[in-house]
């Protein structure tokens, strides 16, 4: 019910305008919103990252034109809406506004409430509020199922990327661990590089691994996550490898990662 109320409120709050017919997406996080919510016929171009293996909806991107995202190339596509998370110029709204092209900013949610709100508003702007409402409803149902699970015996958990980054408060990863029933051991704000000795000396009950087997990180032996001492610590700890596509953008589909963490926390 809450999802439907929010969707209708957004629908009537947004200025009346036709659904965009020539959408250009500037980065692979924006691609996910466009691929999930827009008709294929509405998409003029996606970013060159739309078919990366950490692009959540990469299968839907097959056959759709790609753009490098330069101003000249995008304008040549005659878009009536540009969608971005981080791609293009930092002041994209002002830059494209000079040419009469509106910009929709998406992604970057710090938690699932923010992800839901961004999803619903993007769906309205792309002309398909019912699709956003359906995805938000699925998200809420899955969050409710996680909340109903018995508490894990030891909820202590930590996220670690192959680059040595770990997530603290105010991040989607922190929200993901919490939704899974875990207790994030990093209580500081935002992201930081984890001191390796902390992991080696006091490994948590569960380490959620990100991008350890992804693309170039698979081949880079110099990354902090490849350090022999770290590998030994991880061998002693319980680990779960998170699907790269679920955590590459701060969006609603991070629920996949939450479910993976929840299962690992409660595994015998």
For each feature predicted by the language model, list its residue ranges.
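Extracytoplasmic substrate-binding proteins
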Residues: 19-22, 81, 91-165, 183-189, ...
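A short, structured surface patch at a secondary-structure boundary
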Residues: 22-77, 81-87, 91
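Bacterial N-terminal signal peptides
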Residues: 2-15
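Alpha-helical, coiled-coil/dimerization segments enriched in small aliphatic residues
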Residues: 48-52, 60-63, 166-192
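Alpha-to-beta junction loops
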Residues: 78-82, 202-208
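Short secondary-structure boundary segments
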Residues: 27, 86-87, 189, 210-214
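Short, solvent-exposed loop/turn elements at domain surfaces
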Residues: 31-36, 51-56, 165-169, 209, ...
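Short, structured coil segments at secondary-structure junctions
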Residues: 39, 60, 98-101, 180, ...
């Amino acid at each position: 019910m809450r999802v439907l109320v929010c969707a209708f409120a957004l629908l009537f709050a947004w200025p009346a305008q036709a659904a965009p017919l020539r959408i250009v997406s500037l980065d692979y996080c924006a691609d996910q919103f466009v691929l999930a919510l827009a008709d294929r016929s509405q998409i003029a171009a996606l970013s060159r990252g739309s078919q990366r293996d950490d692009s959540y909806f990469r299968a839907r991107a097959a056959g759709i034109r790609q753009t490098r995202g330069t101003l000249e190339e995008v304008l040549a596509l005659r878009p009536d809406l540009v969608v971005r998370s981080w791609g293009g110029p930092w002041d994209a709204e002002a830059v494209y506004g000079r040419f009469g092209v509106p910009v929709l900013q998406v992604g970057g949610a710090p938690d699932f409430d923010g992800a839901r709100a961004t999803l619903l508003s993007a769906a309205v702007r792309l002309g398909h509020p019912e699709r956003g409402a359906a995805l938000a409803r699925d998200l809420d149902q899955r969050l409710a199922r996680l909340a109903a699970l018995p508490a894990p015996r030891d909820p202590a958990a930590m996220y670690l990327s192959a680059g040595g980054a770990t997530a603290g408060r105010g991040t989607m990863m922190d929200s993901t661990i919490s939704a899974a029933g875990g207790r994030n051991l990093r209580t500081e704000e935002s992201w930081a590089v984890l001191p390796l000795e902390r992991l080696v000396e006091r490994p948590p009950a569960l380490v959620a691994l990100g991008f350890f087997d992804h693309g170039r990180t698979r081949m880079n032996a110099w990354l902090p996550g490849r350090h022999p001492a770290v590998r030994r610590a991880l061998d002693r700890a319980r680990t779960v490898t998170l699907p790269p596509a679920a955590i590459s953008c701060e969006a609603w589909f991070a629920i996949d990662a939450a479910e993976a963490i929840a299962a690992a926390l409660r595994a015998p």
